[in-house]
Amino acid sequence: MARDLIIKALTEAVANAKRAGDLPPGVTAAVELQTPRDPRHGDVSTSLALVLASEVGGPARQIAEKLLRHLELPRDAVDKVEVAGAGFINFTFSPQWLRAVLRLIAEQRDEYGSTDVGGGKSLLLEFVSANPTGPVAVVQGRAAAIGDTLAKLFARTGWNVSREYYVNDALNSTQIQRFAETLEARYLQQFGKKVAIPEDGYQGDYVVDMAQELISSEGDRYLKMAQEERLAAFYEYSLKKIVAGHQRDMEAFGVRFDTWFFESLLYERNEVEAALEALKVGGYTYEADGALWLKATELGDEQDQVLVRKDGRPGYLAADIAYHKNKFDRGFDRLIDIWGPDHQGHVRRTKAGVQALGYDPSRFEILIHQIVRLFRGSEMVRMSKRAGDIVPLAGLLDDVGADAARFFFLMQSMESHLDFDLELAKKQAQDNPVYYVQYAHARISSILREAQDRGVALPVPDVSAVNLNRLEHPDELALIRKLAELPDEIRDAAERYEPHRMTRYAREVASVFHSFYTNCRVLGDDAELTAARLTLVQAAQTVLRIVLDTIGVSAPEKM
């Protein structure tokens, strides 16, 4: 692509400038390109000269002029290069190259924008991993949208991606034990027993529903059991019930996992014990106050962390370290975890444990996403009594649908809090961003259907025979420019962990297309121009379909 040619040419220009004495021999700078907000500033721009000026001193514009003297670019790709402002170098693609993009899209179809940056290396992406103590919450739905989109982005950049959901089902889980105790209390209450739920139990009415379902299927037989036996039965029942619910929620949201990994397997296979032994052998543990501790401060954490409690039960960190050891031992080249906002404090200690086991920390990344707040217009939606202190994802999907939910979850960077407007998400109007993008795809489908009704063969059978030089209107060239950005958008969104770039890009494509549609009649009396514009319209549809598929949103042909 032209951007790659420019980056290569700028890199060589720096090297040539150093050889010619125009730059000091030791200076280095990574070449980065940006898309200017104002199209008058070219198609891409670089601040390379400003970066170099900060290292060597002197005016950035002079350094930019020196770089241009050593810059060699193919004329068929770049039409104009100029220095602007404080020292930016702006590049304008040639119309000839832009038109060639349409041929490339027609040739590659749904593979357009894909690259082999990952080289077939393996990546394990773990996300959602909600505790099995209640329904999947809206905030975890955001994790699902982020994780699934990142998985597709990495797959499109040449990675062999596996998706995994981690289930905290170990018998020593305090949270599941507390849930079993809450379920027991709700079960006994149905028989008139004066039993209070635990002080730190689960308040949602969904626990009452589960108790009633249990009575419908099993009756009162648990009343006769000893409490220990009853709690064990409720532990197992609730775990299966809730995990099955999580699986249904993910299926309804269009998110499919390659593996549902259960924490209990780590204990069954003695992997937690093996990880603890490896930490001991490596000298990263010590005993104090009857507990086993990880020397986390030696590995970048603010304080040492408990691995095994005083009562001999392994803490959550021991299992987390064993789980990530398991991931590495499965042979993955790279690991990415996506965690919720309440797990920020766990990042350093988990990475410390992984590093203590001797694994390369650069192969392991933990991403934190922020909270979601639901609004109806200007009014924030409060938590429901039925769900306790959470808003279930299933309720959101019933309200606005999976398409709107996924699109809206991806409209902000994961580091930002997300305000989700429920009324806007359901609105059948162009100020609803998901409707706006889907409508662009549907409008294109309508154009293509009308063309077929007129006897035009579609898809255009031989794009090489189409005279694309007829595409000269500013709106035509603007649309091609926007379509040409897809490969870089996909690569940047993956490399920078920014799936929200895809919803922004989708809206930009839709906006430029709508402008083109308003000002350029596609089906006219000029057969040659019609063929060229149909080729452009088909390319726009391909790009929109790719982007919508990547973010998990449907691409309707009629609306």
Residue ranges and their predicted role:
Residues 1-99, 106, 110, 114-559:
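Non-catalytic interaction-recognition regions
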